[in-house]
Amino acid sequence: MDIIIKNGTIVTADGISRADLGIKDGKITQIGGALGPAERTIDAAGRYVFPGGIDVHTHVETVSFNTQSADTFATATVAAACGGTTTIVDFCQQDRGHSLAEAVAKWDGMAGGKSAIDYGYHIIVLDPTDSVIEELEVLPDLGITSFKVFMAYRGMNMIDDVTLLKTLDKAVKTGSLVMVHAENGDAADYLRDKFVAEGKTAPIYHALSRPPRVEAEATARALALAEIVNAPIYIVHVTCEESLEEVMRAKSRGVRALAETCTHYLYLTKEDLERPDFEGAKYVFTPPARAKKDHDVLWNALRNGVFETVSSDHCSWLFKGHKDRGRNDFRAIPNGAPGVEERLMMVYQGVNEGRISLTQFVELVATRPAKVFGMFPQKGTIAVGSDADIVLWDPEAEMVIEQTAMHNAMDYSSYEGHKVKGVPKTVLLRGKVIVDEGSYVGEPTDGKFLKRRKYKQ
């Protein structure tokens, strides 16, 4: 064996057990029994042994609002590793007037040899010409089996219903999964412009211009269009009861409706956008944070198996230099917030509070995203033959989240001041220790591109 992990409590989505495990050549080769000698033995007494976290919603080196986000693959993936995440699926964004192949080549240049953990891509389709829709057919051969479209941001990303239908139809034929940002873009734009015309330019009006019904209407429409062409569909970042009801209604009538929520929708509210000294701009993301009552609704849905995962939607817009561009007009504030490092710790608080079980935690942050996005059982579980992506978790360790302790390129944390109990201590990527007792010890060449399998239609 290369490594033996002994005395830990193994937690998977299927159960909890006490067993030692052996690792060789990057794979888990034995669980329990006599393991024999190893080059290194790690004592995991008092710790949970989790599969590495999988974050299927990140925007690492993104360009939007005429500016470049702060993180690189090097900084964002080190942050992810230190938070217990060993795989991300990042959004590879097509440039208008360019092919999808050019987008993939661009992302390969940014991520290749510069990622601390394993990574894959979803494709964001910004310019859905007929030739681009046809080009979607070749993506699964590259291991890219999901793509995203937007029902919001007219003039930037927004597509019409016919294009969404074409995209869904193409996905069925190619074994891919369409991910949809569901907001009624015209309604949001109308309210945004109306508020600004009335002199209402503070960050809070970002939330007020995108009320829950703006999200719910588009969610219902996207699900109906998927139903029309009998396609699976994945609704990203569900935030509120109104949208959740649409997802559940669709499921009840047999639509293959999948959905995620994100960490910030479990903890932040629209009142955070009213923080003084323009601090509210830190919490401008889309869809916006909702009411506190929605936290309970979302946690209940997580417990009841409605959601596939909790993602971070990590997007690294600095407070100084990015967000402050919108001091006089909330429409100029780049939308998005960091969270790839904090994700597992924040979701784990749901275990401490009795909102979800320990096995549900693993299901939501690792196993289910691996299954949905074509990585299981290579990723997302602890089993013989799986990649040795492992997190040793101290359930008793406590910390207060502060940006000074994070590893990204940001100047704030969305969860600044939150006290958490339960933190990752040691992280292995394919059998290599990349975080050792809280310290990053890996290399930027550790991560590899992950070719994902087709979605099971």
Curated annotation (Swiss-Prot):
Enzyme class: hydrolase
Database matches in SUPFAM superfamilies: Composite domain of metallo-dependent hydrolases (SSF51338), Metallo-dependent hydrolases (SSF51556)
InterPro entries (UniProt xref): Amidohydro-rel (IPR006680), Hydantoinase/dihydroPyrase (IPR011778), Metal-dep_hydrolase_composite (IPR011059), Metal_Hydrolase (IPR032466), Metallo-dep_Hydrolases_sf (IPR050378), Urease_alpha_N_dom (IPR011612)
Sites bearing N6-carboxylysine, chain numbering: 148
Chain positions recorded as Zn(2+) 1 binding sites: 57, 59, 148, 313
UniProt keyword terms in alphabetical order: Hydrolase, Metal-binding, Phosphoprotein, Zinc
Modification after translation (UniProt): Carboxylation allows a single lysine to coordinate two zinc ions.
Recorded superkingdom: Bacteria
EC number: 3.5.2.-
Cofactor descriptive note: Binds 2 Zn(2+) ions per subunit.
Cofactor(s) named in the record: Zn(2+)
Task performed by this protein: Catalyzes the stereospecific hydrolysis of the cyclic amide bond of D-hydantoin derivatives.
Family: Belongs to the metallo-dependent hydrolases superfamily. Hydantoinase/dihydropyrimidinase family.
Protein name: D-hydantoinase
Gene name, Swiss-Prot/TrEMBL: hyuA
